[in-house]
């Protein structure tokens, strides 16, 4: 873990705690563990939610298996990320931001992201690769959800830039999704 807020060392949604305000300069996480309960998983930031704000200049996460840049089990607000790079191992799933208890949750049960700004997000996985996963991406007041560039690539699974039921965003750059063997989607949303 780079930053973990919770009652124990496990990635347990029921024990996760809230981030009220967090500012990160550079966060660099790499897992090389090949066995154990998490089997080489690398989460950059893990918490229940962000209540006030989270800012980061650079987040780099490399997992021996799965890798996640920011995992918020219930969602969060006012996230500002300048640059985030996430890469997973040959059979691992990779995600930039997850707003859900787990990566396998249906999007209908995921949490909400509100007022986010991401300048550059790069995600690559051996299996599935996802830039942002949330039930909804919404804005409040005069704030806007501004997405710069998202690049997502997968060797052996789905590649999805943004996966959400509802998304209210301004795309300032481009979303590039590619998969060597399966489907690739820029934005996958129900509404």
Which residues does each PLM region occupy?
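Surface-exposed loop/turn motifs in large extracellular/passenger domains
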Residues: 1-67, 71-191
